[in-house]
Amino acid sequence: MKIGIDAGGTLIKIVQEHDNRRYYRTELTTNIQKVIDWLNNEEIETLKLTGGNAGVIADQIHHSPEIFVEFDASSKGLEILLDEQGHQIEHYIFANVGTGTSFHYFDGKDQQRVGGVGTGGGMIQGLGYLLSNITDYKELTNLAQNGDRDAIDLKVKHIYKDTEPPIPGDLTAANFGNVLHHLDNQFTSANKLASAIGVVGEVITTMAITLAREYKTKHVVYIGSSFNNNQLLREVVENYTVLRGFKPYYIENGAFSGALGALYL
């Protein structure tokens, strides 16, 4: 059996290949000892690691794994997934939305990291808890899916009420900027969480398309564990990218790019 592992700050992503089949699974990083014990009880042909906690795993297992830089591993894995899913693009920006977000430019041969922001899954969970007292990520994102941002976020259409705006009316003028205009309203947890995810999605997209413009490409690829069970984040990112005139790509199993790429480096 061949195993690639991306041991991140929040999640451990695992890719297994055996008998020409591929399997994906995740574990919380808090369960890293469980992963170590599992590896020590498996017959493994190839083991390759990446991510911030790769060294922790390597120090406690009986095997001799190879360790790769996570940026290179993610780029290689993404290249494989793009090809398998029929996306033939030569150069693009990709945003890896994990606990935070890292941005990379791929020129058809090599990747280079071109930026990063602190908005990502960590902000969704942390700010989400402060707004709702919910700690479970799946419960939080499920509730956010039912939220309405219009009572909380100030949109361009709210400013230009009776006039045609010079830019699309659905663009956000100020995140959470509509709150003081609706103090007589009850702000539900669903609405607050939807707006929090909106902030994350719009910041990531704004950064991604700014870099895409700088590197002269229309293609922006989004991967990362923050999209797990988070259809709202995906919709915000894809819609905002299109609204700004760029072409978004959401990659199935993109969160496993690092683990898959490590396996093939």
Curated annotation (Swiss-Prot):
Gene Ontology BP term (one): coenzyme A biosynthetic process
InterPro entries found in the cross-reference section: ATPase_NBD, Type_II_PanK, Type_II_PanK_bac
E.C. designation(s): 2.7.1.33
Annotated ATP binding sites: 6-13, 99, 121-125, 137, 225
Positions of transmembrane segments: none
UniProt subcellular location: Cytoplasm
Catalytic activity: (R)-pantothenate + ATP = (R)-4'-phosphopantothenate + ADP + H(+)
Keywords tagged on the record: ATP-binding, Coenzyme A biosynthesis, Cytoplasm, Kinase, Nucleotide-binding, Transferase
Active site, renumbered: E70 (proton acceptor)
Listed pathway(s): Cofactor biosynthesis; coenzyme A biosynthesis; CoA from (R)-pantothenate: step 1/5
GO cellular component: cytosol
Function recorded in the entry: Catalyzes the phosphorylation of pantothenate (Pan), the first step in CoA biosynthesis.
Subunit relationships: Homodimer.
Name of the protein described by the UniProt record: Type II pantothenate kinase
Organism: Staphylococcus epidermidis (strain ATCC 35984 / DSM 28319 / BCRC 17069 / CCUG 31568 / BM 3577 / RP62A)
